[in-house]
């Protein structure tokens, strides 16, 4: 991409003013993690949801559509699925002839990664027994989870999805490769991410591939499409992970938004429209 659009500049300015204060304050993120309530009640939305073994799953599009997309939402493992995810899932269903399923998974700090792995594994087993043309997709923390999950299912002899598509995935939950572009990221902060990452990992080590896919085995993973902005805190870690994927022989396409911020393909902008065209092209191959 070339010069950043005016719309994206305005969006970034707004994001800077609305950046959560706990992302840059150890005291505030610790307070958040000590007081945040669990998401036990169903999420309310105008969109339809179903129940899968006790897990709420939002659905978009025709159940008989040619393609199936499982979208694992981001939010640093503490933020619930939101309007941005709903709208993107709706767009996917309308433009890609896809039945989109978006699980509402347990969040930190009351829950940790192991619980979500169990729920998503059961859900995925049912899915691959009944549907074809499956794509696993996710943004930010959800993107990192998708990558870890696809590494994990190799160990239990479950089939890979047909493709993996992730936006700004959190690939190193321990943030082990400083320095990071903390000041320039209008959404995320290193201080907050480090503490949240510990909470999400629970009893697992921060370098356990199930929470940090950059440390996992990438051989024989499904083909991938990965997006990142070069002005986001995760850019360096994602770039390093993409190199590991290539070394391990994974068929990966890496798209970098010049001057762009975290999960930029999910925002309304010319850059996001260009990103969606790339996503759409994957469904025509």
Q: What are these model-predicted stretches?
A:
Residues 1-61:
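A glycine/proline-hinged amphipathic helix-loop "lid/cap" segment
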Residues 53-60, 64-285:
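Alpha/beta-hydrolase superfamily serine-hydrolase fold, recognizing
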């Amino acid at each position: 991409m070339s010069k950043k659009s005016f719309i994206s500049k305005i969006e970034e300015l707004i994001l800077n003013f609305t950046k959560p204060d706990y992302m840059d304050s150890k005291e505030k993120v610790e307070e958040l993690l000590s007081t945040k309530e669990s998401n036990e009640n169903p999420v309310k939305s105008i969109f339809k949801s179903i129940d899968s073994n006790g897990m709420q799953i939002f659905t978009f599009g025709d159940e008989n559509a040619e393609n199936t997309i499982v979208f694992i939402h981001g939010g640093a493992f503490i933020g619930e699925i939101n309007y941005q995810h709903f709208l993107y899932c709706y767009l996917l269903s309308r433009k890609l002839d896809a039945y989109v399923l978006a699980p509402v998974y347990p969040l930190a700090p009351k829950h940790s990664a192991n619980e979500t792995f169990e729920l998503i594994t059961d859900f995925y087993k049912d899915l691959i027994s009944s549907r074809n043309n499956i794509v696993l997709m996710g943004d930010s923390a959800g993107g990192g989870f998708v990558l870890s999950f696809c590494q994990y299912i190799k160990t239990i002899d479950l089939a890979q999805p047909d493709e993996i598509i992730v936006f700004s995935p959190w690939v190193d939950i321990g943030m082990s490769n400083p320095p990071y572009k903390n000041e320039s990221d209008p959404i995320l902060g290193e201080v907050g991410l480090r503490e949240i990452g510990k909470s999400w990992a629970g009893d697992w080590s921060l370098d356990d591939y199930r929470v940090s896919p950059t440390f996992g085995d990438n051989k024989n993973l499904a083909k991938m499409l990965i997006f990142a902005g070069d002005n986001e805190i995760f850019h360096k870690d994602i770039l390093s992970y993409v190199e590991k994927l290539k070394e391990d022989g994974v068929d990966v396409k890496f798209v970098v938004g010049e001057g762009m911020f975290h999960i930029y393909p999910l925002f309304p902008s010319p850059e996001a429209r260009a990103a969606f065209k790339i996503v759409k092209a994957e469904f025509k191959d």
